[in-house]
């Protein structure tokens, strides 16, 4: 896989709360230079990114119910519609982790479906399951519910919890959802070796702030 092909699999990400206008402008400039799949940013930065990336192939990705997933499904649905209206092409939503652990699967599925329905095929939907907080059984169940709810992707992590993507989790997620859905590895992918390991195990997208280091064959100390 060459640098260009790898770049097209990366969501160039900045989700830290202190990200200012200059940070978003820099992120978008880099995304255009490397032709990354998207920029992944917080909802308040969607309008600016959409303006900066207009006419390019780089998509605008934002996050919903982030990073805890503890908002109500009504709030997540509103966030989704609002983000799309402001220019988002992709939305990465966080599941309600507590409800999953309660085995309230009906709630978890409805929560995901609220975002899928709000997106109304106008934006790709990615479901963050926060693998570091789940048992193997819970990871499988979360992926099954995301698939049942009609989401486009499952995603490992927010990058704000206790761990990120591992090749083992990617393999399990890919085996669970099958070949039709996307699988996004995020959190802790900091080098070309990390990227190759998750791709080998079934990742079709990578979320990283270390995107340039990955493409240039370097190693970043970034946490996302």
UniProtKB/Swiss-Prot annotation:
Which terms under GO biological process does the entry name? 2-deoxyribose 1-phosphate catabolic process; carbohydrate catabolic process; deoxyribonucleotide catabolic process
Pathway(s) per entry: Carbohydrate degradation; 2-deoxy-D-ribose 1-phosphate degradation; D-glyceraldehyde 3-phosphate and acetaldehyde from 2-deoxy-alpha-D-ribose 1-phosphate: step 2/2
Q: Which GO terms describe its molecular function?
A: deoxyribose-phosphate aldolase activity
Record: active site: 92 (proton donor/acceptor), 155 (schiff-base intermediate with acetaldehyde), 184 (proton donor/acceptor)
Quick one: signal sequence residues?
none
Q: Look up the EC number in the record and give it.
A: 4.1.2.4
A Pfam family annotated for this UniProt entry: DeoC
- Cysteines paired by S-S bonds: none
Highest taxon listed in the record's lineage:
Bacteria
**Claim: Nucleotide-binding is one of the keywords in the record:** no
Q: Which GO terms describe its cellular component?
A: cytoplasm
Q: Which CDD domains match?
A: DeoC
Q: Which UniProt keywords apply?
A: Cytoplasm, Lyase, Schiff base
User: Where does this protein reside within or beyond the cell?
Assistant: Cytoplasm
Query: What reaction(s) does this enzyme catalyze?
Result: 2-deoxy-D-ribose 5-phosphate = D-glyceraldehyde 3-phosphate + acetaldehyde
Q: What is its main location?
A: cytoplasm
Q: What family is it from?
A: Belongs to the DeoC/FbaB aldolase family. DeoC type 1 subfamily.
Function description = Catalyzes a reversible aldol reaction between acetaldehyde and D-glyceraldehyde 3-phosphate to generate 2-deoxy-D-ribose 5-phosphate.
Know the name of this protein?
A: Deoxyribose-phosphate aldolase
Q: Which organism is it from?
A: Clostridium perfringens (strain 13 / Type A)
Q: Which gene encodes it?
A: deoC
């Amino acid at each position: 896989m060459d640098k260009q092909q790898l770049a097209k699999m990366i969501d160039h990400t900045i989700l830290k709360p202190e990200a200012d206008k200059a940070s978003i402008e820099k992120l978008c400039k880099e995304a255009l230079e490397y032709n990354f799949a998207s920029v992944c940013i917080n909802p308040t930065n969607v309008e600016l990114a959409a303006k900066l990336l207009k006419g390019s192939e780089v998509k605008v990705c934002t996050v919903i119910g982030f990073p805890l997933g503890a908002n109500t499904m009504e709030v997540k649905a509103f966030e989704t519609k609002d983000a799309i209206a402001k220019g988002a092409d992709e939305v990465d939503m966080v599941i309600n982790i507590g409800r999953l652990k309660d085995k309230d699967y009906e709630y978890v599925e409805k929560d995901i479906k609220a975002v899928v329905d709000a997106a109304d095929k106008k934006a790709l939907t990615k479901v963050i399951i926060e693998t570091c907080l789940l048992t193997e059984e819970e990871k499988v169940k979360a992926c099954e519910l995301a698939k049942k709810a009609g989401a486009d992707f499952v995603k490992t992590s927010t990058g704000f919890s206790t761990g990120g993507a591992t090749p083992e989790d990617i393999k399990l997620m890919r085996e669970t959802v099958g070949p039709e859905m996307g699988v996004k590895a995020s959190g802790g992918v900091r080098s070309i070796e990390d990227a190759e390991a998750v791709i080998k195990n079934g990742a079709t997208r990578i979320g990283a702030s270390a995107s340039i280091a990955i493409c240039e064959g370097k190693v970043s100390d970034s946490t996302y």
